[in-house]
Amino acid sequence: MEAIKTDICVIGAGSGGLSVAAGASQMGADVVLIEQGEMGGDCLNYGCVPSKALLAAAESVQAARDAGRFGVHMAEPVIDFGQVHQHVRDVIDGIAPHDSQERFEGLGVNVIRASASFTEPKTVAAGDYEITAKRFVVATGSSAAVPPIPGLAEVPFLTNETIFSVHEKPEHLIIIGGGPIGCEMAQAHRRLGCKVTLLELFTMMPKDDPELVDVVRQRLIAEGIDVREGIGVEAVEGQGTALRVVTSDGAIDGSHVLVAAGRKPNTESLGLAAAGVETERGAIQVDARLRTNKKHIFAIGDVTGGYQFTHQAGYHAGVVVRNILFRVPAKVDDSSIPWVSYTEPELAHVGLSEEQLMQQDAKGTVLRSDFAGNDRARATGQGEGLLKVMVDRKGKIRGASMVGPHAGEVIQPWILAISQGLHIRAMTGYRAPYPTLGEINKAAASSFYTPTLYSSRTQRLVRWLMKLP
């Protein structure tokens, strides 16, 4: 084996690993980056990017179907499923150069395409190389968790890694799991002409506000998706495109089965025992500085078992770079981590939920504003939705939850507000352009002062002032 000594060895070329490698190398560190699969990781190749490209195609179909409400009448759209997936492939190919081996080698990173495994705490074997480093960053991400359902392993089930390789329209897609991936894929495929059944053992999108989730639920049902919650999957059988899912509520026949029942950290082949790194349920345990119990080994992103978002992995990368390069004791702060589910309407959240606020501050306030009261939403026929803003007794913004058009975009001022510890007055003092969806933010914030502004005390004061010359 060829021996390599380096400052930093990054294992995994997903969003987190690439950010560490690019940043550290451009700041002067010697960096080795190891990746056994595709550069760009899950997000580019099997996750965020292809799913949003597919959703965009599905949204265009739905827009054509809904055009009649604006007086624009057209025939039912003809869907070329193969061309839809070519669009998905084109989007991936357009972004791939940014994450490519060639680009990173151009940045001075030594890229090794092989599987990596620790042989001892400060050494990793990867292909024909043995890498010794001062610091290691494990950024191997996660993969679809496959539940132990009898018969599932014997049928050609799909996961997020394989569904974008299906170039012929599934006649009946049965989805196991009602989280964001399951709900997004259910809506996309239904809009593209597939029959879709969505199965969830508990309730769909359980980490989000139940009131807001119900808006999404009702939309999915209205679009023809068979949503079944509280349903256990007992077995899967069949072959090819003749599959049967046996549930606690009876059997369902379909052509394809998508498993979207959570994710698991990718740690099995890393040789963590040889490095002495502690894990729990497969996830690498880290402290607030993202250090493992071996302080020279860091872990970031999905592999730590926490929030599984691309933007979280990127944030982790920044924390690690500050710790490794500048010896700054930077720590993770998840108080303002946002997430978005890209159904239509979108579902977005940041900070404390309504329930969490009430647990922490019984005198806190939940401000509400409906998209039905937003003129831009009305004009575009998208008045379905709601914003909730969580404010503590002192007026500090603690959280925001939203369901509605472009919620992932509209919620962003609240992310900034929470990250900066702002008071609700900060969201009332700016001028929001009219008519925009973002006006809903100012409307919600202004409602904090409504009880005071329109109180009997204020009315008495105004009447007295009006008597003055």
Regions found by a protein language model. Give the residues of each.
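Beta1/beta-strand and adjacent pyrophosphate-binding region of the FAD-binding site
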Residues: 2-14, 169-176
